[in-house]
Regions:
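Exposed beta-strand face motif in extracellular beta-rich ectodomains
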Residues: 92-96
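Long, contiguous interaction/targeting segments characteristic
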Residues: 1-11
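Aromatic-rich carbohydrate-binding modules that target alpha-glucans
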Residues: 48-90, 101-116
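A structural signal for beta-rich interaction modules in eukaryotic proteins
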Residues: 12, 16-53, 61
């Protein structure tokens, strides 16, 4: 794991701040989200705490009960947690949850996470 301040993330200071400000093991930056712009998702939740070998960010857009354009993104393990930087592809609600290599899911108690 090494020095958590080192790595390929040019915003290591921002990852540290996100780590401190996390809510239920998840932080998103920047907010509000803007379609076409990049967003960073930091995950330190249940799957990370249980030692997942790999975590995926499961993303979809639209109403909470009808996700569209659903995609899984492999996250990168850092000293601050699992991180993924991606472009917000849609103007609809940004919905997401997480799963690991053993098909365990963290969906925020069935509510998922979302930003409008």
């Amino acid at each position: 794991m090494g020095d958590r301040r080192r790595g390929r993330w040019p915003t290591e200071g921002r990852l540290e701040q996100m780590h401190r400000e996390r809510y239920a093991g998840v932080a998103v930056d920047p907010v509000p989200l803007t379609a076409g712009e990049e967003v960073t998702v930091l995950y330190q939740g249940l799957l990370a705490e249980k030692g997942a070998e790999q975590v995926w960010l499961h993303v979809g857009y639209g109403p909470a009960d009808r996700w569209e354009n659903v995609t899984d993104y492999a996250m990168e393990k850092t000293g601050w947690g699992w991180v993924k930087k991606l472009r917000v592809e849609d103007t609809g609600r940004f919905n997401f949850c997480f799963h690991d290599n053993a098909n365990n899911w963290d969906n925020n108690g069935g509510l998922n996470w979302s930003y409008e």
